[in-house]
Amino acid sequence: MKLFIVLVAGMPGAGKSIVSKAARDLGLPVYNMGDVIRMETSRLYGIITPETMRETSRRVRKLYGEDYVARKTIEQIKEKRGVIVVDGVRSLVEVEVFKKYAETVILAVHASPKTRFERIRKRNRPGDPDNWEDFVKRDLTELQFGLGNVIALADYMIVNEGSIEEAYRGAYNILKKLVEKNAKDNSDS
Ligand SMILES: Nc1ncnc2c1ncn2[C@@H]1O[C@H](COP(=O)(O)OP(=O)(O)OP(=O)(O)O)[C@@H](O)[C@H]1O
């Protein structure tokens, strides 16, 4: 069985965690690229806050290259087989790193800024922006990493403007089809 990577991309609060939930329910391993930053943040700052996370994010890219987070994620997954999900890809440079190791597709989750802002406010995650200006600032930081390009080149798109159940069903069906396709491709070859 070959490795097949589903790269999940979306702006903050778009609903990427719904895709992770659907993946876990299908028994697929999920890797979060944010975990690499979380580990580096503890190493560099000894404390994890949204500010130290953001600073680490910028710092490691500058020090070790735009592809660093993807390379670190690859170290964890390259021995894996079958369909896996990687949450949080942010640039085409990162996409290229994954493409070298396996067949990949990009699954994007989209919701309008207004919807994302309302949902972020409700989820009450520490460090989330609580006003429109900070929300826009965070969006721009993500876009500077190149996230907009990844979303523009997505193979699949979930528009998450309806209910959570609807988005979950969309994600579940896409992932299930990919699992079936990968199984078929492997039995053919
Ligand atoms: N369709 C929906 N209806 C209502 N609430 C939703 C919907 N989709 C997501 N949410 C809620 O909106 C919030 C943001 O979603 P989620 O945390 O999945 O976003 P994310 O893309 O993982 O964000 P980040 O990149 O910031 O981690 C969560 O509290 C989630 O439960």
UniProtKB/Swiss-Prot annotation:
Pfam families: AAA_17
Residues where ATP binds: 10-17
SUPFAM superfamilies recorded: P-loop containing nucleoside triphosphate hydrolases
Nucleotide-binding found in the keyword field: yes
Keywords: ATP-binding, Nucleotide-binding
Keyword match Ribonucleoprotein: no
Domain of life of the source: Archaea
A single GO molecular function term of this UniProt record: ATP binding
Family recorded in the similarity comment: Belongs to the UPF0200 family.
Name of the protein in its database record: UPF0200 protein Smar_1234
